[in-house]
Every structure is written in C-alpha cells, then in structure tokens.
Amino acid sequence: MLDIIIAVIIDWIIGDPYWFPHPVIYIGKLIKMLEKLGRRFFKQDKWLLVFGGFIVIIVSSISFLIPFIILQGVKKFQVIYHVINIFFLWTVLAAKSLHKEGKKVYTALEKKDIEDARLKLSYIVGRQTEGLSKKEIIRADVETIAENSSDGIIAPLLFAMLGGAPLAMMYKGINTMDSMLGYMNFKYRYIGFFPAKIDDLFNFIPARVTGIIMCLVSPIIGGNIFYSIKIMLRDRKNHKSPNCAYPEAAAAAASGIMLGGTNIYFGEVVEKPTIGEEKNELSDFHITKTIILMYSSEILFIIIYVIIICFLGKH
C-alpha cells in the first residue's frame, strides 16, 4: 500500500522526465519491431490477424515477467525490493505528464498562438490537428485528459492494487499496444485487431470506475454528482470504444460542456456521437477544470483503496 502511495507522490512531483529511459519506450520499440517482422513475413490479412494475437501474447508476457522476475530476485533484500517496486509503479502512472502536456495546449491558447496549440495537441492525440479551431482544440485536449485519467492513472493503479507492479506493467504493455496498433483503419484493422480487443477487455472495469469516481468528485469543479451520473449513463455508448465514453461523459457533465463529434484520423473522417450537454461554451478554463478533476479522482481512488485495506486488515 505504501509503495503505491509513494509512487503516486513521485509521479506528482517529477512525472516522466524526457531524458529518462522510460520502460514504455522499450515496450514501444518491441511492438514496433514485432509489427515490422509481421509485415515482412505475412502479406495476407488472415495471417496479419493471427500475428496480431502473437504480438499480444509476447508483449503482455514480457511486460509482466521482467518486473516479476526482478522483484522475486531481490525479495530477500526488502529495501532494494521496495525501491524497485516503487520505480515500476511510478513508471506506469501519468498524472503529471497528462497535466504538463495538457497545460502546454492551454498556455499556447492563452498566448493566442493557435498554431502552437495545434502542434502541442498533436503530441498527445491521434487525430489530425491541422486546421482545428480553438474550440476543437479545447475539446480534444479535454477529451484526452479525461480518457487518459482512466488509461494513465486509475487503470494502472487498479492493476497495481490487484497484482502489484508486474500486473500494472502488463497493463501498460497492453495499453501501449493499443495506442500503437489498435486503429480500425485500413493499415491496422488486421494486425491491430487483437491488441485493440485485449485493451478493451482490460479497460472495461477501470473506465467505469473512473467515470463513477469523476462523478463523485465533480462538485469540486462546480458539477453535480447526480447530474454527472445521469449524463454518464445516458452517453456511455456514444463512442466507438466500449470504454472511453465513461470518463469523457463524466468529465463533460462535471463541466457542463459537450464533447465528441467529427474528427480526422490518418486522413480518414470519423463521425462520433456527441457526449454531454452544452450548458457552457468551451473555454480555456475547461482544460484546467479537467486537470483538477483528474487529480481529484486519483486522490479519491487512493483514499478508497486505503480505507478498504485498513478495513480488511482489521478483519
């Protein structure tokens, strides 16, 4: 329990420094290498589909086994064990990184530098950012922070609570696969099919937990718990992903804004249903409000975890 709390605090303070050799970088290199290998040897769609399943097995196994073997190897040395465990837990969390990258877009908008805002946004979203209006930039930034509050914070924390650093790292490997391969366009619809589906499976519970927690903390940014729950449940299916709409709808309801709509991914126009209700016009401040919502959700989730552990410890 203490290791997780320390890892969260470290993430809040230093985040993911650009110079640091982050484990996800090496997971990404492995995925890229496997994709190249698959495309080199398999040209038929059915074999690319099968190879995508092979990538899932390899990446998830390695992501789990490396931290597991290392931690088992140093288990007798408690101080070293906890230092390494905290290190792995820290690397799966992304609150400070989300805050920092999301705020860069906000800062560019405050300076009225729309081109720089589009550029900064392009670093954190998969959609095409060229030509986006100010409102579309804000919407994309808010959606990304809300969605990644699940993928980058609540989900890894949940898996860390259930199975320690190895399971959290395994989740991170699966999530990285999805971000690199899980697109349902012409290029990735076969090799990315299984990476996308396994990510949907692993995010099924975390996304819903994130949505509920966001609703509970919504009054912190001026929202209403019951209204947020109502909108989340109403709009939970307004997304191509079975999971993303939960945190996005909760965040939209908390701020009284509308998300979703038309986006362009890799040159293809993707029509999405809208999420939330436009009670308030999108403004720069909604980026800040979503960041506050993200941190508040993480804190409440940790508090709930500590209460459960203390309760179980007494029984």
From Swiss-Prot:
The chain crosses the membrane at residues 1-21, 50-70, 79-99, 151-171, 209-229, 250-270, 291-311. It is found in: Cell membrane. It comes from the Bacteria. Pathway: Cofactor biosynthesis; adenosylcobalamin biosynthesis. GO terms for biological process: cobalamin biosynthetic process. Its main location: membrane. Signal peptide: none annotated. Keywords: Cell membrane, Cobalamin biosynthesis, Membrane, Transmembrane, Transmembrane helix. InterPro entries: Cobalamin_biosynth_CobD/CbiB. One of its GO terms (molecular function) is threonine-phosphate decarboxylase activity. It is a multi-pass membrane protein. One of its GO terms (cellular component) is plasma membrane. Belongs to the CobD/CbiB family. PANTHER family: COBALAMIN BIOSYNTHESIS PROTEIN CBIB. Converts cobyric acid to cobinamide by the addition of aminopropanol on the F carboxylic group. This is Cobalamin biosynthesis protein CobD. The gene is cobD.
